[in-house]
Amino acid sequence: MAVYLLAVAILFCIQGWPSGTVQGQAMSFMEVYERSVCQTREMLVSILDEYPSEVAHLFRPSCVTVLRCGGCCTDESLTCTATGKRSVGREIMRVDPRKGTSKIEVMQFTEHTECECRPRSTVNNGKRKKNPKEGEPRAKFPLV
């Protein structure tokens, strides 16, 4: 048994731990960079966040995995934005607690297919932000 554990430890030292790094060493800059860039990645989304009008039902599971844009851009003035989308189906159990019934059905979710870093000033939930007119204050605060 001790020989087996020693062999496994040596193998991990040579090949790296499952996380992709040798124990005690930092992840390389290139690996950190590649994992953090703006790209589609698997994310959990709440079914009720996607279907807010469905509050009368319970869903199992209560969230699903879909590809969504996420990650860092090279400049703080940019944000990772979806430039391509598609609809995907997921089998979900819908429970009606009032009737005591349940059924499995396919629900549609938006999945991102392409991402791009875009200026924050033009992205606001898919709508362009209104720029203040010249001479107009940027923010209006109530007088106290």
UniProtKB/Swiss-Prot annotation:
Residues 1-24 form the signal peptide. PROSITE patterns: PDGF_1 (PS00249), PDGF_2 (PS50278). The keyword Ion transport does not apply. InterPro entries: Cystine-knot_cytokine (IPR029034), PD_growth_factor_CS (IPR023581), PDGF/VEGF_dom (IPR000072), PDGF/VEGF_growth_factor (IPR050507). It comes from the Eukaryota. The keyword tRNA processing does not apply. Residues 132-144 have a biased composition (Basic and acidic residues). One of its GO terms (cellular component) is extracellular space. SMART domains: PDGF. Homodimer; disulfide-linked. Interacts with VEGF receptor-1 (FLT1) with a high affinity, whereas it binds to VEGF receptor-2 (KDR) with a low affinity. Does not bind VEGF receptor-3 (FLT4). Snake venom VEGFs that may contribute to venom dispersion and prey subjugation by inducing vascular permeability and hypotension. This protein induces an increase in capillary permeability after intradermal injection, as well as a drastic hypotensive effect after intravenous injection. The hypotension is mediated by nitric oxide (NO), which is produced by VEGF-activated endothelium NO synthase. Also induces angiogenesis in vitro. Like other crotalid VEGFs, this protein interacts with VEGF receptor-1 (FLT1) with a high affinity, whereas it binds to VEGF receptor-2 (KDR) with a low affinity. This is Snake venom vascular endothelial growth factor toxin cratrin.
